[in-house]
C-alpha cells in the first residue's frame, strides 16, 4: 500500500490489526487445547470470545467513517508470533512448563495488540474520528486487562507449578 497521508497510515494499521485479530481467532482455540492448566485454557477461550467482539468493533470503526475501507493484507507480525507459539507446542510436553511458555507467547501477542490499538486510537483522535477512537480505546483497555490476567495467572499459578516440575 502506498501511504501518502496520515489517513493512509491509519487505514494500513487498521487493516493490519484486522488481519492480526482474524489470525488470532484461529490460534487461540489451538492454544486452549495445548495447555494442561484448566484456568489457562479458560483464559484462552475467554480471549477468543473477546477477540470476536474486537473484530466486530473494527467493523464498527469502518462503518463509522464513510471514507474508511479495510485493505486485504496479512499481518506478518502476528503470523510470526503465532508461529512462535506453535514452536512452543511442538517443543514441549503437555505440562506446566509448556503452560508457562504459552503464557509468555500469549503476552507477546497482547503487547503487540496493545501497541497496535494504542497507535490506532491516537491516530483516530488526530483524524477527528471520535466514534472510532472510542471503539479503539475500548479494545485497548480489553487488551491491557487480558495482559494483566495472564500475568496474574503466571505469577500465582502456572509459573509456580512449572518451577516445582524441575
Swiss-Prot record:
| Highest taxon, organism lineage | Bacteria
Q: Which GO terms describe its biological process?
A: DNA damage response
Care to name a GO molecular-function term for this sequence? protein homodimerization activity
Known InterPro entries for this protein? DUF892_YciF-like (IPR010287), Ferritin-like (IPR012347), Ferritin-like_SF (IPR009078), YciF (IPR047114)
Parts of the chain that traverse the membrane: none
Q: Which Pfam families match?
A: DUF892
Q: How does it assemble?
A: Homodimer.
PANTHER family found in the cross-reference section: PROTEIN YCIF
Task: Please identify the protein, giving its name as recorded.
Answer: Protein YciF
Q: Which gene encodes it?
A: yciF
